[in-house]
């Protein structure tokens, strides 16, 4: 939070419990570019003061020009270098990185970009499982420093239940993508890779008709995804060390 007392309270709790954390920025949505830039700058500096492992940022807007979004990325990179806190930019609808084909030119021009990869958004935007955008996918994998692990489809950013056999193809593909991100992190000798199982609440999670009851239990599915990723990690390490 921007409020100093609230921020101090949270930071003290994190210190007392010896917790690392990933900070989240999503608030900046101003249409006016100058106001947007100023607010983004303020939020990033505010989060960096808390010394998180990294800041996951919803950066830019899908309707800004390439040059405007590039200016925001350059500013964030300057803040990262100044503070020593990594800033990752989430692949998210409505932001500069809303689609695979529009994110690729930024990755090609700016090698310093770190991504929070959530390809479920890209699948939904492209109305495909991105089988025809392998260049963008492979490039994004190499830039991934943080993973939001949600299983999406060509029609929705979140399948109703990734445990459902009807969603097996989607689950297998996302596990492969996440595995490739982990392999790249190992190959480039990263200190760590952070992952958040992100099966979201409503409106990501659908309600049963005429109720306020979610069709699936959010905690159960995120725990399922966590276990799937852990199993995949073990397999990757065994394969690399065999």
Residue ranges and their predicted role:
Residues 16, 20-21, 25-26, 30-114, ...:
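Active-site acidic/histidine proton-transfer and metal-coordination neighborhood
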Residues 109-113, 123-242:
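Histidine-acidic metal/acid-base catalytic patches
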Residues 1, 55-57, 115, 147, ...:
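Hydrophobic residues within beta-strands of alpha/beta enzymes
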Residues 1-42, 223-242:
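N-terminal pre-domain/capping segments
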Residues 47, 87, 118, 147, ...:
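Conserved, mostly hydrophobic/aromatic
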Residues 1-2, 24-29, 60-62, 90-94, ...:
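Active-site beta-loop-alpha junctions enriched in small/polar residues
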Residues 11-14, 37, 69-72, 101-104, ...:
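Short, glycine/charged-enriched secondary-structure capping and boundary segments
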Residues 7-11, 40-45, 70-77, 100-107, ...:
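Generic structural signal for well-ordered alpha-helices
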